[in-house]
């Protein structure tokens, strides 16, 4: 059925940066078939589902390119620690207690939070109960890139078992749910996967035609320890083993790198998921996004898990990313307002290798959100792009659509039972802490 959303301010995020102050969009079979200024013709609207946006702002759905929704019960569980202690002393021991019910509760909680704050697409890097989650994503109507991450600090036999699990999941779910679910392979990090194991995973990814996702250079300690063991930075080792070329890489973090490393990643069309709030909370440092951009790296945004953030609000992430770069570089135009919005939308689509996504254009997937501009912090309302980056909040989002199907309308979730999910999340955490 044709759907028309009319009476909206349409922020297209196309290359021309077109904004229709009073416009409408037409959606058929999950894609945009028209984006126009003014009102739809009476003939065109005949037989269509016409939605009056009532002057809301309509923009592409936000895209979260790095996270661990399975950890969402751990929100606020352990603060004020660096990454290494946070993981070893708190998170990993808690993860040993996770079972299917707890992980399901965590993930459903995350999907509620993401939809309510305008995220339509996300990446999940985790190792537990992925098939159940893929089915839940399909039912909830979201778009996702999912992967069974692997840690290689084990025997070669166990390494191969983990890789086989990862490949099996990737094959089962790649391009499923009407193309809304894609998969990757995911060595956890250079410090948890020996070089030979990463090489084996990359070889498998090349054979399967799958991208690879990995944590990279998140903390200074990680890099110092790695160089003590291998005599070089992990990016240099990847290059020495010819693992950067012929592989679609998406790296998370990339905080502790130098110009030569950015140059290598840019030369091999790698993408980076910048997670500024998580990096700040854990005291990991500030990634040099401006240097990444200079070398042609596609920089997108991720939240990491709520255990280290503590929210999944990409508006907060966008704002933090732009402001940090201006502050550390003492330059007000080094990451522009438009570039900040791009990181949360079209660059996210590129990083996850989703075609026809991330902008409001004819032929693009109809993943979009609407915000209520009738908020004091969004007025005067003439500078919408500036407000979206520097003032908007996830709570301003009122409507969320994926492939033209509504997941939330007028702040009401349509595919998830929020009341039940919140109750279950609290019950599961209490059970784990007993």
From Swiss-Prot:
Q: Which residues participate in substrate binding?
A: 95, 148, 188, 218, 304
**SS bonds (residue pairs):** none
Q: Does the keyword Amino-acid biosynthesis apply?
A: no
Q: Which cofactor does it need?
A: Zn(2+)
Q: Establish whether keyword Transport is in the entry.
A: no
Print the keywords alphabetically.
Hydrolase, Metal-binding, Zinc
User: Matching CDD domains, A to Z?
Assistant: ATZ_TRZ_like
Q: Which domain of life is it from?
A: Bacteria
Q: Which SUPFAM superfamilies match?
A: Composite domain of metallo-dependent hydrolases, Metallo-dependent hydrolases
**Cofactor comment text:** Binds 1 zinc ion per subunit.
Q: Where does Zn(2+) bind?
A: 66, 68, 215, 304
Q: Which Gene3D superfamilies match?
A: Metal-dependent hydrolases (3.20.20.140), Urease, subunit C, domain 1 (2.30.40.10)
Catalytic activities: S-adenosyl-L-homocysteine + H2O + H(+) = S-inosyl-L-homocysteine + NH4(+); S-methyl-5'-thioadenosine + H2O + H(+) = S-methyl-5'-thioinosine + NH4(+)
EC no.? Answer: 3.5.4.28, 3.5.4.31
GO MF terms, alphabetically ordered:
5'-methylthioadenosine deaminase activity; metal ion binding; S-adenosylhomocysteine deaminase activity
Family membership: Belongs to the metallo-dependent hydrolases superfamily. MTA/SAH deaminase family.
Summarize the protein's role.
Catalyzes the deamination of 5-methylthioadenosine and S-adenosyl-L-homocysteine into 5-methylthioinosine and S-inosyl-L-homocysteine, respectively. Is also able to deaminate adenosine.
- Record's protein name: 5-methylthioadenosine/S-adenosylhomocysteine deaminase
This chain's source organism reads Shouchella clausii (strain KSM-K16) (Alkalihalobacillus clausii)
